[in-house]
Amino acid sequence: MFARSVSVGLDIASDAVRVVWCRSRRQGWELLGWHSINVPAGTFQGDRLIAPEALRDVLSQIHKILPRRLARLCIALPGAAVMQKTLMVDAFLTEQERLFRVEAELPSLFPLPPHELAFDFRAEGAETANGRLKLVVTAARRELMNDYLAVLQGAGLQADIVDITPLALRRALEQAQAALPPALELEQQLLVHLSARNLLVTSVPGSPLFFRDQPLNIPQSEGNSVPPALLQEQRLSEVTRQLGLIRQMYHSTGRQSSGLLVSGQLRESDTRVLSTQLSVPVQGWSPFAGLSLAVSVPQQEDAWPFTLACGLAVWEGN
């Protein structure tokens, strides 16, 4: 159907699997399709996959609707499952030498044996005056990653890229940036993705990576006797509380945020409350903004669930 330039972003969440597929064109990305399928209750416990067969069945359905020829399929590990540390090295080291150095330092960086970790690293910032360079080392349990990859394989899919959700969120905003208000000072914003059960906050593209992925400590609506209006009020209160704490953590790094860019499950009235309580402007945005469209897309208030899948689909690495 399409040339082998189709890139697929697959967001595996505890409530649903969401997929976006795009084609890279000279003038940018073209959206070719998007879809979601709910995940049966009990498939996940928090971020832990406890019923792989149920997830495999959902992924098999997803596989059937995707184009047959793909350039890449990108998934992401949840931010809460990821550990991150920094390491200073000599700037003159080659990439291979940096890898050896990171491997040697793994026992002191993370509280798990090195053989239990899957890790990656990247340079951040410029070389210091004394010839040093900061490496950001990201790691996750190898068992967790292998669980996801095995389920994908069982559904006939293969992940070419395993990313992390904070970077997917940043990338989604990066491709939608042209649709944001011109007067917005992007470097002063924090990115927020609010799902039914989690709050993901990260710094904007182009800045040093900061992120927090927090579960929302509120009752879920399924089988709950609490009135929906009260549940919504409790949820908004919890989101406001956690965002306040995360902004304090961010400011403690020496950076400031004067606004929030939110993709998530928020009504317009909730956005106003959030803005008032935190004393900052809150701006919504659509992950599909900035894409040329070969298919129709949902309105902004319904587009937010596809934010991470969209950010994964527009991955531009090699």
Model-derived regions, located:
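Hydrophobic/aromatic-enriched cytosolic interaction surfaces used to assemble or bind macromolecules
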Residues: 1-318
